[in-house]
Amino acid sequence: GSWLTALTSDLGAGRFDGAWLVQNFENLDPANTLWSKQYNLYANVDTEGPRYLQFEKYWGGHVFLNDVEMQYIVDNLFIGNKLSTAQLMTSDGVRIDLRNIRSPIVVFCSYGDNITPPPQALGWITDLYRNDLDVLGHDQTIVYATHDSIGHLGIFVSGSVGRKEHQEFAENIDIIDVLPAGIHHMQIDEHPDPVQEGDPTSDVFLTRIRRSSIDEVREIVRPDPENDRRFAAVARISEVNLACYRSFVQPWMRALVTDQGAKWLEQLHPLRMGYELWSDRHPLAAAVHEAAQHVRDHRQPVSEANPFLQLQAQFSTAVEQMLDQFRDCRDQIYAQAFDTLYSLPLVQAMTGQSLHDDAPPRPRPSETPEHRQYLAQELTRLEADIHSGGLAEAVIRALFFVLAARGEADGRHFRHAEQLVRPHLGSDFDMQAFRHLVRRQALLMRLDQDAVVSAIPGLLNDIAPDEIRQVAEMIVQVVGSSDVLSAQEQARLEQVAALFEQADHQAQAPQKKTASKTPAAPRTSQTRRGKGK
């Protein structure tokens, strides 16, 4: 439970030492901590030194958190998991609900992350939403991307991730910002077109964004009610243990620990001791420095086929595999012990959960009557916008309708769509206006696609026939800009063309009618005299 967090903060005189978090993180991967990191340094000593020292300087900069801050994080996020169920409140009484965020939310997670794997990183979505209609009703855009192997730390500092995922996120931020409400999956692949050397606009990667769904996210998360009951028991036991610590132990700890004692404990931490025990101030450091210089001056390269070099690599691999097996066995024992202990009926009964209790152990914000009423009101309000709009709205609807069967789009489609719509939004075009337009039309398409598409001719009533025909031709160009159309997409494109042609005829009809009612020019006197003859 979180009483250990309180104890650690008390031992630090009100400060939580971040070195303990770093040590726990390193314990998750003993092979890298105890062997691989050092082996890679010496196996590539000619090039690895600067990078190793740079990382160690960053990794060894342990931060401190105040006790109230750290305790709140552990109780409400790590154990209570209250953020994903809208249970957190600010000091002025405002509820923190992730569904109220209107900017796109981007989630990047990895299956190689043993701290926040995809089921945990995406679990808040299934906690807050029952279905895709819920997401649309809250006008929220969620984009998630997954990596196959990168670890927890690598998500933030890996060079390969920085060159690929981070760069693509930054370069496509305007595209992400214009995505319609709903859940989307981002995939970053090698660009199919060859990169032009010296061309700054060439991109090595092609970002594709396809429509996803709650069901697809649920397949990743795999919600387990029994697991929720176990964690509910953990949270309750943690609250009891923390209350006991605060009542009976904490007063004594705070009375005994002084600022000077906290400083001594800080310096005696194993991670800091490793830097202090061996440094330039060590008596043997000068001798080692001279020996190292002698080795540098007399080093001789060996062939890759050298049996001792191969034996060295094989031995290193064996050590890594042994430590990995130890880690896997340890983690499996922890998981089985956790499941066994907190699944016991006695333990769950002691935390207020009976055997025949069908109520979910965690609140579900999407299942409350207030939420259902709010959703119904939002959908009713959206229905009123089906027949409102103009040429820009008609263009967006046509593009969405044709490409809906594809289920994905890449950066080229968004750039072409922007170029197509920009002239019809006026001289004051900005990305925010375009984003609002796209999101609104996407909501309407998801609400009632047939009605929204059928309303396109009505949106073009006040548009000149020439402009309607020009826009229809541009839609064909944008839709076929990158890929060959499928039979379904071709049929939808023909349907859209027919709707624009219908609007063209409707626009021409008033002009013909006006021309037929124009009075004839008056006859001249010469004409009248000719008739008199």
Residue ranges and their predicted role:
Residues G1-A31, D134-L136, Q140-T141, T146-S149, ...:
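A catalytic-pocket lid/entrance helix-loop region that shapes and gates access to the active site
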Residues I101, V107-C109, D113:
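Short beta-strand/loop motif that positions the catalytic acidic residue
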Residues L133-A233, F326-R330, Y334, F338, ...:
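Catalytic active-site module of serine/aspartate enzymes centered on a nucleophile-bearing elbow/loop
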Residues Q250-S388, E393:
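Extended non-globular C-terminal regions
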Residues W59-R95:
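Mobile cap/lid helix-loop segments that gate and shape the active-site cleft of serine hydrolases
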Residues I115-Q120:
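Conserved alpha/beta-hydrolase "acid-adjacent" motif
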Residues H356-K533:
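Small-residue-enriched hydrophobic alpha-helices in membranes
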Residues G1-V68, G182, E197-R299, S303, ...:
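Alpha/beta-hydrolase-fold enzymes
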